[in-house]
Amino acid sequence: MADQLIRATAADGGIRAVGVISTRLTEEARVRHKLSYVATAALGRAMTSGLLLASSMKREGSRVNIRIKGDGPLGGLLVDAGLDGTVRGYVGNPSVELPPNAKGKLDVGGAVGRDGYLYVVRDVGYGYPYSSTVELVSGEVGDDVAHYLITSEQTPSALLVGVFVDVTGVIASGGILLQVMPKAARDEELVSTLESRVGQLTGFTPLLRAGKTLPEIFEQLLGDLGLVILPEIQMVRFDCHCSFERVLGALKMLGEAELQDMIEKDDGAEATCQFCGEVYQASREHLTQLIEDLRAQSG
């Protein structure tokens, strides 16, 4: 199944639902960053969460940054997701590996750490990003993002994200976000019903591995609540904005002395993008041209 995002409503618009399949993009991140099993699960959950959060934004070019800094050996992670369906991200320690947790699953909470903070920055394109910080509740990513939605945005929310990875790579990755909108938030029975149904699920990836599609998952959860699945299917993908031109721009900011030192010591420069792992090589000729440009600007 292709990576995709779909939206739906239920209860006469009182419930907003979003679902994401992110298997291929999580696999691309795993390969690019050479991620361990648990690092793959952590970053995959975070990238899926980023896409789910970005899906509610309205203005073209809007993006969401999720940064998690816990006390675990993963060393934190950072995700950048857009309303356009693009996402990228990285972890501090891609090779970290831990024994399974008490449930026999990948110990994402242990890798991330249970003491720390989740930082969310929403950039809606007006030049004034909105930022919020909440304490981690479990380090499992999904619980922490749901906690952010409830405490910072005061929106009753259920968020379920998951990644299944084995020796062959990422087999399944994705998630769903259910939110009770303000006009229905006082309906305690509706909120309780949603919590109960989501709580009965054993996870998100088992549904995908069983062959369930996103519409079928929504039907299972919301079918008797006036479910309306919106017709648009949005493709989502791992995508980075880095380029050789940006690398040259960053090198130029180092100044003439530093560039000259690179030429003399290394005969060039190498830069690696943290978000996607792409390696860029700037030759002696490139650096010499940057120095000439700087001299021309100062002259």
UniProtKB/Swiss-Prot annotation:
**Under the GO molecular function aspect, what terms does this record hold?**
protein folding chaperone; unfolded protein binding
Cellular-component GO terms for this entry: cytoplasm
Which biological processes are named by the entry's GO terms? protein refolding
Concerning Pfam families, the annotation shows: HSP33
- Compartments it resides in: Cytoplasm
Gene3D superfamilies annotated for this entry? Hsp33 domain (3.55.30.10), HSP33 redox switch-like (3.90.1280.10)
Please describe the post-translational modifications of this protein.
Under oxidizing conditions two disulfide bonds are formed involving the reactive cysteines. Under reducing conditions zinc is bound to the reactive cysteines and the protein is inactive.
Bridged cysteine pairs (disulfide): 240-242, 273-276
The answer to whether UniProt assigns keyword Cytoplasm to this entry is yes
Give the keywords, sorted. Answer: Chaperone, Cytoplasm, Disulfide bond, Redox-active center, Zinc
Spell out the InterPro entries in the cross-references: Heat_shock_Hsp33, Heat_shock_Hsp33_C, Heat_shock_Hsp33_N
SUPFAM superfamilies to which the protein is assigned, alphabetical? Hsp33 domain (SSF64397), HSP33 redox switch-like (SSF118352)
Q: Which NCBIfam families does the UniProt entry name for this protein?
A: PRK00114.1
Matching HAMAP family, A to Z?
HslO
Physiological role:
Redox regulated molecular chaperone. Protects both thermally unfolding and oxidatively damaged proteins from irreversible aggregation. Plays an important role in the bacterial defense system toward oxidative stress.
Q: Which family does it belong to?
A: Belongs to the HSP33 family.
Q: Which PANTHER family match?
A: 33 KDA CHAPERONIN
- For this entry, the protein name equals 33 kDa chaperonin
Species assigned in the record: Gloeothece citriformis (strain PCC 7424)
